[in-house]
Amino acid sequence: MANPVGFRFRPTDGEIVDIYLRPKNLESNTSHVDEVISTVDICSFDPWDLPSHSRMKTRDQVWYFFGRKENKYGKGDRQIRKTKSGFWKKTGVTMDIMRKTGDREKIGEKRVLVFKNHGGSKSDWAMHEYHATFSSPNQIMTYTLCKVKFKGERREFSVATGSGIKHTHSLIPPTNNSGVLSVETEGSLFHSQESQNPSQFSGFLDVDALDRDFCNILSDDFKGFFNDDDEQSKIVSMQDDRNNHTPQKPLTGVFSDHSTDGSDSDPISATTISIQTLSTCPSFGSSNPLYQITDLQESPNSIKLVSLAQEVSKTPGTGIDNDAQGTEIGEHKLGQETIKNKRAGFFHRMIQKFVKKIHLRT
């Protein structure tokens, strides 16, 4: 039912009971009141869902409904007032409604109720529930008339009308194949929290600023923590890939020795020496000597390196293997200790920064 411009449906308490509620309960033909006020089960809907069921489309944020009276118990006058998201709570005392003309008799009662969400938090929704009273005991009241009112701002009402729709947002961030939270995902979570309006958190600027600072601390330290693990994994992978190491090419040079005694009987000769350099990651179990020195042209004054090479080559290969294996085990243990120390340091730094931020805020 569309209202003309300037039309307002604002009946008084006496008009609500005398003109609409009493005919709804007493008369057999109620079409003239049903065209104005719709009949609904009030407690089957949350208050923000009721405006869409009203026949009167108004911008006053007040809606009228007929509702069938349903007692909570077989005896007594207590009614069912529980909805899906909360309940209607009676407040104040019951007020009598008197007829303004004639004998000024009592024609009804008005009860004021407020809607409370689960948990007892009060909302901006209120309801005036009207009951008709009859002089004859044979007249039984079947219907009540409810005036539902939203006392908040219109902008808040537009949000409240959509609050019945449930939105589900996933709080589980994506992970990689190993089930570990990636650094990019971790950073995006913290940045998304920082970009939100502080009023959406707690409403207190100091607490929200502290929350954002803590997120920044976590973001920086988590990135450094994961980077340290990446570097450690690279070191371990290098240690595990020793057999694929290619030895360096031999170095060839010319060494000349000039005699200091000035004798011409022993001519000065040049010695060409080929040296195979020692690799940092030798191939274990190899029978080849670590150093191979070849004297291409012997001379009394040439550099004596052959004996040194022979002594080195006489060293058993098993001893080298055992030492190398021991070194590898020691490096692996050292890597594990490094990871533990970095993790402990990460949590220590995070707690220190957070405590420092708390002191600055307070």
UniProtKB/Swiss-Prot annotation:
Residues annotated to bind DNA: 107-157
Region (Disordered) location: 240-266
Pfam families in the record: NAM
Species: Arabidopsis thaliana
The protein's name in its UniProt record: NAC domain-containing protein 5
GO biological process, one term: xylem development
Subcellular location(s) per record: Nucleus
Nucleus among keywords: yes
Keywords, in A-Z order: DNA-binding, Nucleus, Transcription, Transcription regulation
